Protein backbone atom coordinates (compact mmCIF):
# COMPACT_ATOMS: atom_id res chain seq x y z
CA UNK A 1 0.00 0.00 0.00
CA UNK A 2 1.64 3.25 -1.10
CA UNK A 3 0.59 6.60 -2.45
CA UNK A 4 3.33 6.35 -5.08
CA UNK A 5 1.73 3.26 -6.63
CA UNK A 6 -1.70 4.87 -6.48
CA UNK A 7 -0.42 8.02 -8.19
CA UNK A 8 1.31 6.01 -10.92
CA UNK A 9 -1.96 4.19 -11.57
CA UNK A 10 -3.97 7.41 -11.72
CA UNK A 11 -1.50 9.05 -14.10
CA UNK A 12 -1.65 6.00 -16.36
CA UNK A 13 -5.44 5.64 -16.33
CA UNK A 14 -6.33 9.35 -16.52
CA UNK A 15 -3.24 10.77 -18.22
CA UNK A 16 -5.10 13.30 -20.46
CA UNK A 17 -6.53 15.08 -17.41
CA UNK A 18 -3.07 15.79 -15.99
CA UNK A 19 -1.12 16.44 -19.20
CA UNK A 20 -0.02 19.67 -20.83
CA UNK A 21 0.97 23.08 -19.53
CA UNK A 22 -2.57 23.96 -18.42
CA UNK A 23 -4.07 20.68 -17.22
CA UNK A 24 -7.68 20.59 -15.99
CA UNK A 25 -6.77 18.50 -12.94
CA UNK A 26 -4.01 18.68 -10.33
CA UNK A 27 -2.64 16.97 -7.24
CA UNK A 28 -3.28 18.75 -3.95
CA UNK A 29 -3.01 17.80 -0.27
CA UNK A 30 -0.21 15.85 1.36
CA UNK A 31 0.89 14.10 -1.84
CA UNK A 32 1.49 17.48 -3.50
CA UNK A 33 3.60 18.45 -0.48
CA UNK A 34 5.58 15.20 -0.62
CA UNK A 35 6.21 15.58 -4.36
CA UNK A 36 7.72 19.01 -3.66
CA UNK A 37 10.15 17.73 -1.05
CA UNK A 38 8.29 17.62 2.26
CA UNK A 39 9.09 14.61 4.43
CA UNK A 40 5.55 13.33 4.83
CA UNK A 41 3.83 9.94 4.67
CA UNK A 42 0.55 10.61 2.79
CA UNK A 43 -2.29 8.23 3.55
CA UNK A 44 -4.49 9.21 0.62
CA UNK A 45 -4.30 10.96 -2.75
CA UNK A 46 -6.26 14.20 -3.16
CA UNK A 47 -7.02 15.47 -6.67
CA UNK A 48 -8.78 18.64 -7.78
CA UNK A 49 -10.61 19.43 -11.01
CA UNK A 50 -11.07 22.87 -12.51
CA UNK A 51 -14.64 22.03 -13.58
CA UNK A 52 -17.30 19.45 -12.66
CA UNK A 53 -16.97 17.95 -16.15
CA UNK A 54 -13.47 16.75 -15.35
CA UNK A 55 -14.70 14.93 -12.25
CA UNK A 56 -17.29 13.16 -14.40
CA UNK A 57 -14.62 12.22 -16.95
CA UNK A 58 -12.26 11.00 -14.24
CA UNK A 59 -15.00 8.74 -12.87
CA UNK A 60 -15.51 7.28 -16.35
CA UNK A 61 -11.80 6.56 -16.67
CA UNK A 62 -11.72 4.94 -13.21
CA UNK A 63 -14.45 2.42 -14.04
CA UNK A 64 -12.15 -0.55 -13.39
CA UNK A 65 -11.75 0.56 -9.75
CA UNK A 66 -15.47 1.00 -9.06
CA UNK A 67 -17.39 -2.02 -7.74
CA UNK A 68 -20.86 -2.60 -9.15
CA UNK A 69 -22.50 -1.65 -5.88
CA UNK A 70 -21.40 -0.39 -2.48
CA UNK A 71 -23.44 -0.52 0.70
CA UNK A 72 -22.98 3.15 1.48
CA UNK A 73 -22.36 3.97 5.14
CA UNK A 74 -23.92 6.95 6.83
CA UNK A 75 -20.49 8.51 7.40
CA UNK A 76 -19.06 10.40 4.42
CA UNK A 77 -15.52 9.36 5.33
CA UNK A 78 -16.22 5.75 4.28
CA UNK A 79 -18.27 6.44 1.14
CA UNK A 80 -16.87 4.89 -2.07
CA UNK A 81 -17.69 5.35 -5.73
CA UNK A 82 -19.43 2.50 -7.51
CA UNK A 83 -20.87 1.73 -10.94
CA UNK A 84 -24.29 2.41 -9.46
CA UNK A 85 -23.25 5.76 -7.95
CA UNK A 86 -19.89 6.92 -9.35
CA UNK A 87 -20.12 10.41 -7.85
CA UNK A 88 -21.57 12.22 -4.88
CA UNK A 89 -23.01 15.55 -6.04
CA UNK A 90 -24.58 18.26 -3.94
CA UNK A 91 -24.09 20.90 -1.26
CA UNK A 92 -22.52 20.29 2.12
CA UNK A 93 -23.62 21.83 5.41
CA UNK A 94 -21.65 25.01 4.67
CA UNK A 95 -23.07 25.67 1.21
CA UNK A 96 -20.14 24.33 -0.83
CA UNK A 97 -21.35 22.34 -3.84
CA UNK A 98 -19.33 19.17 -4.41
CA UNK A 99 -18.76 16.88 -7.35
CA UNK A 100 -16.85 14.12 -5.61
CA UNK A 101 -15.60 10.59 -6.16
CA UNK A 102 -13.53 8.22 -4.05
CA UNK A 103 -11.85 4.99 -5.13
CA UNK A 104 -9.48 2.50 -3.54
CA UNK A 105 -6.36 2.09 -5.66
CA UNK A 106 -3.58 -0.19 -4.44
CA UNK A 107 -5.11 0.13 -0.97
CA UNK A 108 -5.00 3.94 -1.01
CA UNK A 109 -8.01 6.25 -1.05
CA UNK A 110 -8.01 8.35 -4.22
CA UNK A 111 -10.33 11.34 -4.04
CA UNK A 112 -11.24 13.62 -6.94
CA UNK A 113 -13.33 16.74 -6.41
CA UNK A 114 -14.57 19.99 -7.79
CA UNK A 115 -15.84 22.28 -5.02
CA UNK A 116 -17.85 25.40 -5.79
CA UNK A 117 -17.80 27.90 -2.93
CA UNK A 118 -20.99 29.68 -1.87
CA UNK A 119 -21.67 33.17 -3.16
CA UNK A 120 -19.67 35.78 -1.29
CA UNK A 121 -16.90 33.37 -0.26
CA UNK A 122 -13.84 35.55 0.53
CA UNK A 123 -10.96 35.48 -1.96
CA UNK A 124 -7.35 36.62 -1.93
CA UNK A 125 -8.37 40.12 -3.04
CA UNK A 126 -10.38 40.33 0.19
CA UNK A 127 -7.31 39.45 2.27
CA UNK A 128 -8.50 35.89 2.89
CA UNK A 129 -5.66 34.17 1.06
CA UNK A 130 -5.91 31.49 -1.64
CA UNK A 131 -8.00 28.44 -0.88
CA UNK A 132 -6.06 25.31 -1.87
CA UNK A 133 -9.17 23.64 -3.31
CA UNK A 134 -10.51 26.79 -4.95
CA UNK A 135 -10.50 28.44 -8.38
CA UNK A 136 -7.53 30.75 -7.72
CA UNK A 137 -4.92 27.97 -7.77
CA UNK A 138 -5.02 27.26 -11.49
CA UNK A 139 -2.79 30.09 -12.80
CA UNK A 140 -0.16 29.10 -10.23
CA UNK A 141 0.15 25.33 -10.80
CA UNK A 142 3.66 23.93 -10.68
CA UNK A 143 4.94 20.81 -12.42
CA UNK A 144 7.22 18.30 -10.70
CA UNK A 145 8.84 15.17 -12.07
CA UNK A 146 7.57 11.85 -10.75
CA UNK A 147 8.30 8.46 -12.33
CA UNK A 148 9.39 10.23 -15.50
CA UNK A 149 6.17 12.24 -15.77
CA UNK A 150 5.37 15.93 -15.27
CA UNK A 151 2.78 16.11 -12.53
CA UNK A 152 0.75 19.29 -11.89
CA UNK A 153 0.66 20.21 -8.21
CA UNK A 154 -0.59 23.10 -6.12
CA UNK A 155 2.51 25.05 -4.99
CA UNK A 156 3.77 24.92 -1.43
CA UNK A 157 3.38 28.70 -1.36
CA UNK A 158 -0.39 28.15 -1.50
CA UNK A 159 -0.42 25.06 0.71
CA UNK A 160 1.16 26.98 3.58
CA UNK A 161 -2.11 28.90 4.00
CA UNK A 162 -4.10 25.67 4.37
CA UNK A 163 -1.56 24.27 6.79
CA UNK A 164 -1.50 27.35 9.00
CA UNK A 165 -5.27 27.84 9.00
CA UNK A 166 -5.78 24.22 10.08
CA UNK A 167 -3.15 24.46 12.80
CA UNK A 168 -0.98 21.71 11.29
CA UNK A 169 2.27 22.69 12.98
CA UNK A 170 4.39 19.77 11.75
CA UNK A 171 3.30 20.23 8.14
CA UNK A 172 3.78 23.98 8.38
CA UNK A 173 7.34 23.37 9.59
CA UNK A 174 7.98 20.91 6.74
CA UNK A 175 6.68 23.31 4.09
CA UNK A 176 8.62 26.22 5.57
CA UNK A 177 11.85 24.20 5.62
CA UNK A 178 11.49 23.34 1.92
CA UNK A 179 10.67 26.93 1.01
CA UNK A 180 13.74 28.14 2.92
CA UNK A 181 15.94 25.81 0.87
CA UNK A 182 14.36 26.57 -2.51
CA UNK A 183 13.42 29.63 -4.52
CA UNK A 184 10.35 30.64 -2.55
CA UNK A 185 7.97 32.87 -4.51
CA UNK A 186 7.42 35.52 -1.85
CA UNK A 187 4.91 37.42 -3.99
CA UNK A 188 2.76 34.31 -4.32
CA UNK A 189 3.06 33.62 -0.59
CA UNK A 190 1.85 37.11 0.24
CA UNK A 191 -1.14 36.63 -2.04
CA UNK A 192 -1.84 33.10 -0.83
CA UNK A 193 -1.66 33.87 2.88
CA UNK A 194 -4.49 35.51 4.75
CA UNK A 195 -3.67 38.75 6.51
CA UNK A 196 -3.84 36.90 9.82
CA UNK A 197 -1.01 34.53 8.85
CA UNK A 198 1.44 36.76 6.97
CA UNK A 199 3.37 38.05 9.98
CA UNK A 200 3.67 34.57 11.51
CA UNK A 201 4.94 33.13 8.23
CA UNK A 202 7.49 35.92 7.77
CA UNK A 203 8.90 35.06 11.20
CA UNK A 204 9.13 31.38 10.24
CA UNK A 205 10.64 31.79 6.78
CA UNK A 206 13.21 34.36 7.92
CA UNK A 207 14.26 32.23 10.88
CA UNK A 208 17.12 29.71 10.87
CA UNK A 209 16.79 26.84 8.39
CA UNK A 210 16.68 23.35 9.86
What does each of the following model-derived ranges do?
Residues 1-210:
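Compositionally biased terminal segments of proteins
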